[in-house]
Amino acid sequence: MEQMAKRLHEKMTRYNWTGFYLVDPADPNYLIVGPFAGSFTPNARIPLDRGLCGAAATTGKVIVVQDVSADPRYLAGSSLVKSEIVVPIFVNKKLAAELDIESYFAGTFTPPERQFIESCASVVANYLSTAH
């Protein structure tokens, strides 16, 4: 996961924060920041009922926001962020993690970009399912 976050961050120049949130083993009502690349995030622990990460966790669906200023669910980690995608990662039909990517550019996450990011999350899901 660490390598994937690092490589995506390095190679995809419009990705300004790339990382994973994991279901907190101590309290599954929270997500905790996992491996990431980019600036420090003040959102190291997120309740499942808050933010775009919480929305992806509770709905089980990919969340794509092309303009975070227009979405009241957005938890600001940086005032520079303009768009975000969150892809839930399931292992044995249970939420295990999320791939979260933020961009300083509005409209970054086009349908082909989304498909690519979902395929990256799928690789992580396969890895996690064999690691458990």
Indicate where each model-derived feature is located:
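Intrinsically disordered, low-complexity terminal regulatory regions
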Residues: 1-40, 128-132
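Short hydrophobic/aromatic beta-strand element in the GNAT-like acyltransferase core
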Residues: 17, 86, 98
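Regulatory sensory and allosteric helical modules in signal-transduction proteins
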Residues: 21-79
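Conserved beta-strand segments that form the floor/walls of ligand-binding pockets within enzyme
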Residues: 63-64, 88, 100
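A short, aliphatic-rich beta-strand micro-motif
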Residues: 83-90
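Flexible loop/coil segments at beta-strand boundaries within sensory signal-transduction domains
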Residues: 90-95, 131
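Sensory beta-strand/linker motifs that couple input domains to effectors
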Residues: 93-103
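Juxtadomain coupling helices with adjacent low-complexity linkers
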Residues: 103-132
